[in-house]
């Protein structure tokens, strides 16, 4: 009985103290036991019938229906009797149940534990309280006794001493039932007594070194109450005012296991039943499962709240000692970190986190989280041990996070973009995490500076599982670092922070739950913030490291094209011992073995590559030595080459250590002095020794290059001598290339392509020949290309020489000839005071340009022009123009200003200007310069006079192109006589729109046209004796036939108009008048006289009607003008028809040019053609001829007698000239409008819009001799766009212009109503080749408009 549980012990004690116990007491006891067992069996089913009403505010009152729970007393009595009979069997079963419970719970149940739970009450008190409790419980329902043992009740803060579980009475009526437990629960089903709360006491001990996965969170300290969590089933004091057994604070020494064991026997020891074993086992399993579930719920709950929240929640646990509180604080912090990192890891994959953006974000989040948490190496308690729950001040923070941010941004580019190491793509894979090892960072060698992080190797595999196996208390400062480092590396606080940043940003897979480990594993090289030095190790311990550093620096300084050259060129492996190459890196160099091996391979490959380049250079040197026969080689042998000098200066290792290939920082100011004595003026040396700079070295330099290779064989290659030799070779190579590149020379790689040219083309000879080409001294127009380009074939040399000659001649003569003509045009337009005699300047310039064009053609054909050709050209030019004009003409000056070096084919030298006294003299042999461009035209015009024939035969005709006519008559009183414009110029433009080039096809075409019309023109001239003409020597040197009528008309020019003209023009008119007066005595034919000439002379004013610019203005004026001229129809016109019948097949009229200013010298010729047309159309009426003859005689007499009638006619002519000249300029628009209403233009009975006439250039040339003042006035109405078609055939344009010529003179035309046998429709010249069925001029104009 000593070892029985407290209920049985209590019962046994009470039974001993009451010897007079009756059998009914035994029946009651057995009934209670059986009722309790039955209640436990029905308890899972009774949970579904809980009361949903809230508890009443009064402690003993409940509103649940009592009928459901209560049983009748009669049934209870019967049940008690039956239970009394089964009492012996129940006791036996109870003892068996107790033994099974002891076997299941193990050795945790001992007497001491029971004493702590039951209390130190003496047996007397227990015996005294037992009857009271028994009597009191006998009056209460037995079903309501179970909830009083529920451990879910909150502890009473007023209780200060533990009370006995069996002897402590309830403060109020025991009305708490199972239905009261569900008052604050959700409607889902739950386990009543077998389901503990979500925050139960820990079921198992939680030592710091062996955490159990099923362990729940530790309980809070004494004096704390647990606040209700979510999904909680706790009954707080507010929900349950009356509890059966108010529990005090459990002592700290009591473990969770003891608490659980103590509660189970108290429940199961109240009675005996077969179902007790199964109920207790199920309760035990449920407790374990719920504890594990609550642990996961707690972690999930803590992960969704900030650290302050879960610290507060962790503090609300109970039954926690001071050591347990520290352990719980550490565990809660670590759990929160793990949850944070797990959430971050779920965002993306591992490859995404390896990107620089993920590293940056993870590092920022880590810095923020570390700033918010405390230093876990020295954890502080989370709670005070006093009665009041109060949290300590905020946790201690690490160093300023701005330091981390500065260091991170400073090394950000090196962290992520400094890789791959040595800018080699083969090392990309090793920059990140490998399978067996973790590298902090590969050395990010950059071009401009070295990295401040040393390549340290992590030898052990870091895994989160490794740290979970060790308790947090072991992670102290004495923890050994996991990174192997050399003794020379001493971590600094700044370096530690950087190492932490590198670890946390580069390896986010590591759990940050152990910052103390990361803190102790920071290894980095000491570095300054401004200038970072690479590999700052004592050179005394490792003497080969300075050389390695210089090699790495030199490797970094080399351009990228050198590093990638192994893909382009095939390298040849030199015969170097393997030991010398493997000893490039020192043994204790702080890099991983794999990275070390790749670095060595990379350096070997680079050395081999440059060695192969040197071998190729030497092969080219050998090849060039075989061909080295020029004297420049001996001179090159005399002086040391840049390579040789650089080799001599770089032999000592002391100087080699000072050489650093910092090409990026210092491109070249002093590199030539460091790498060798390069010539200061390489361009001068290249001229004298072209092969020295271009790479042709002597045998001595070759020996000096290979000499160190032979001497370094053997044991010396194992030491620093080999490295010095390699450095010298690279230094010489780079210095040589750099010197050539800086001076703009050809690099070594293209030397082979220069060999042939270098041997055959010396630089000095090339310069000499080039200067000779620029200014040749001899007249031989060829270049000796055999000496300059000896490597070419003879045929190629000959063709190249011919091409050079033609090209030179073209560019030497072509541009001046093309520019000369527009220049002359501009100059002549600007000079308005030039006389008519100065118009020969453009003609002479054109002759010279024509001769120059022949010279140019001959030069292109490699035929030097003969001296006779030059003489002929100069003779024609001198005969064509006066010497004074020749000397003063711009063409002559331009010709005299020929630069030196131009080949001269004139043996007599340049022409000299005539003396000043001979400026006004005319040449003895005037040149018959027909502006039509043909000798046949001059012959046809000169058939009227033998003097003209002699002049034509004296000097041959010089053919000039189309532009000659335009330039020759460009400035015939350009500004004063505004009606005279050049054909190639518009009204407001000074620039000619025609080409200034010579075209032989145009010359041939003009000649054919003139030959076609020559017979008719000559016949017509010979068969018209009634027209008197005189050969006049015009001021421009042209012999022209001027009829007498022209003399009269010229003499009729009013004196006022002559006074308004410039002095040069007036002088020209006076000279013309004197010449014509001198020729009157030599007339061959006599003129018939007619007394009716006065009528025709008086009616000369309407003879020059204006040409309006529209047909609408012509139509009304046409009828008026026809009525006005109706009185001119007399029977005296019949002789004209007879004359026309004899010559209608031979008459050829010349075209009047549109924008063409005929000079005064051609005025008589135009009038002659006009009268020829009159007499050819009217053969039946010879009276007008007599009238015209009498008119010319009358006019001639009026000139000398100064009669009033002649003066009036001249005044009228002058007024008409002024009015017509004003039509071509915009500033005389008002005058033009006035004259439009005054004058009319009859157009052969039909309106014809002459604005749409299109002529060819040759038609203009042929009509120039027949152009007159009326033609000029007519051409003013033509548009400027007629120049668009200039190369059309002149046949139809001749006919059309003849019609236009006749339409301009209304005094000889009949009105519409007159029936006259003379009609322009019947008497067109048949030699023109056109049919006579064209009825009116607009039809011909439309024909030419469509051509």
UniProtKB/Swiss-Prot annotation:
This protein's UniProt keywords: Differentiation, Membrane, Spermatogenesis, Transmembrane, Transmembrane helix
Domain of life, source organism: Eukaryota
Region ranges (Disordered): 55-89, 106-235, 373-397, 628-658, 899-955, 1085-1160
Cellular component terms (Gene Ontology): membrane
InterPro entries, sorted: SPATA31 (IPR039509), SPATA31F3-like (IPR027970)
Residue spans of biased composition, Pro residues class: 198-222
Recorded topology in the membrane: Single-pass membrane protein
Pfam families documented for this protein: DUF4599, FAM75
Compositionally skewed regions (Basic and acidic residues) per UniProt: 1108-1127, 1137-1146
Subcellular location(s) per record: Membrane
Ranges of compositional bias, category Basic residues: 60-82
Biased amino acid composition, Polar residues: 165-178, 631-651, 927-948
Gene Ontology biological process terms, A to Z: cell differentiation; spermatogenesis
Membrane-spanning parts: 23-43
Family to which the UniProt record says this protein belongs: Belongs to the SPATA31 family.
Function: May play a role in spermatogenesis.
PANTHER family cross-referenced by the UniProt entry: ACROSOME-SPECIFIC PROTEIN, SPERMATOGENESIS-ASSOCIATED PROTEIN 31A1-RELATED
Protein name: Spermatogenesis-associated protein 31A1
Species per Swiss-Prot/TrEMBL record: Homo sapiens (Human)
Organism taxonomic ancestry: Eukaryota, Metazoa, Chordata, Craniata, Vertebrata
